[in-house]
Structures are given as C-alpha cells and as structure tokens.
Regions:
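Sec-dependent N-terminal signal peptides
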Residues: 4-15
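Catalytic-domain carbohydrate-binding cleft regions of carbohydrate-active enzymes
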Residues: 20-238
C-alpha cells in the first residue's frame, strides 16, 4: 500500500427511500499507514507520524467542520512519546468530537494468523490505552488492508463489546490468482461461529478510488447499493 493514504470515506444514508430530499451524506477524512512494511518503525515515527499530525491538525484548525479518523494504539503512543505538544491538541479534538479514534486494537490485527487470545489481547490493550488516554473506547474492527477475515472475527468482536467491522480488501478476490467467489454483501450483519452478529461493511471499495468531482446525488450506482441492504446505506472510500 502507499506510504501514507488520506482516505475520504463517505457514507450516504437514506431513511427509507433513496431520494434526493431524504439523503444524508457524511464525509470523513481518514489516514492509514502500516506501522512497518517496506520501511521500519523508525521511519514511521520520524516521517509518517509527523506528516499525519501536521496535515490534519492544520485542517482541523482551519475548517471548523473538518473531522478525522485515525486508528492504532501504538501510533498514538508514538505521538505521545515523540510529539507531546501535538498529542495534547489531539486530546482536545477528541473531546470536541472532531478527531475520532477508529478501530479498537493496539495495532492492525491479521485475523488469519494469531490465536483467538492474541486477537482478544490486541483489542484489550488498545481499549485500555484509549480509555486511559482519551476517556473513550473504540466500537469497531477497522481493517482496510488485511488479507483475509476468519469466521471467528464477529464472535471475538461481539464478545469484546464491539459492534462493527469494515474492510476494502475483499475486492482483491476478483483479481487473478485470488479466487472468483463473490463478496457476500456490501453492508449487513455478519454472524460468527457462536451466532454472535456485528454490523459489517464487506466492500468499502478501493481505498485509492478517485473521485471525479461529480454530483453523486442521482448516482444509480450508489442507489443500487443503498437499496440492496436493510439500512439503505452506502459506505464508500474516495
């Protein structure tokens, strides 16, 4: 994935019928980067963390309606340790409801590899940090960039007090050598091995999608997605 991604996530929600006068749209900015991938942790701390802070604190200070999502307890810990002044600004914006703690884990989880206990502890340590530092808790599993999601995920999430899950990675199944099975649904309820259920966005679309500056009010594509699920909602990366 890119070294740093600024995603615009838009959620279009219709009360019952998808029509222009009953649609509500939320545009929320989000930054996502791996703690380490084709770079080391030191580079994340030295370069990617301050870029995320500088860009988004500027936008928060400039535009009163700007809101921002960011995930990963370990990244917040780095902010606290290496950028304490900006960290205090983050805490203020969290109190104001403009900086949202996304996800609930200490760092991005790979549900294909760890044991159930390691997955649960990842949530436990992340939530403990968020409660101690910000007085809030995450409500979801946020994994835009993971290569598979086991049937145990809804069960672990539900037993951890979480209510949601989202990803864009299932669209990779349509690429060569990744299989041809279809994505189960865009938005709906995902039931785990023990019958526990959470709200799930199975297809948030590619996080490098380009918006062509078009009016989406009458988009048949978005209408079809909204009408295909009981919430009449669309969750889409731009």
């Amino acid at each position: 994935m890119k070294r740093i991604l600024l995603l615009l996530m838009s959620v279009f929600i219709a009360a019952a019928v998808f029509s222009q006068d009953r649609v509500r749209a939320y545009l929320v900015s989000n930054a996502h980067f791996d703690s380490q991938w084709n770079w080391d942790v030191q580079r994340s701390i030295r370069e990617y963390i301050p870029k995320t802070l500088d860009q988004n604190l500027f936008l928060l200070g400039t535009y009163p309606d700007y809101v921002f999502n960011f995930e990963g307890g370990i990244k917040y810990q780095w902010m606290k340790e290496y950028y304490p002044h900006q960290y205090e600004l983050i805490k203020r914006y969290i109190r104001e409801g403009r900086w949202h703690v996304t996800g609930s884990t200490w760092d991005a989880t790979d549900p294909n590899i760890p044991s159930a206990e390691s997955f649960t502890r990842n949530i436990l340590y992340g939530q403990h940090f968020y409660r101690r530092e910000f007085g809030v808790e995450g409500t979801d599993i946020f994994l835009p960039d993971c290569f598979g999601f086991g049937w145990t995920l809804p069960t672990i999430a539900a037993h951890s007090g979480l209510i949601g899950f989202s990803t864009q990675k299932l669209m990779w199944r349509h690429r060569p050598f990744h299989g041809t099975s279809k994505i189960p649904f865009e938005i709906g309820l995902w039931q785990g091995v023990d019958g526990s259920r959470i709200m799930a966005v199975m297809d948030a679309h590619n996080y490098t999608t380009k918006w062509r500056y078009e009016d989406l009010s009458h988009s048949k594509y978005l209408q079809d997605i909204a009408q295909s699920n009981p919430l009449n909602a669309v969750y889409h990366y731009y």
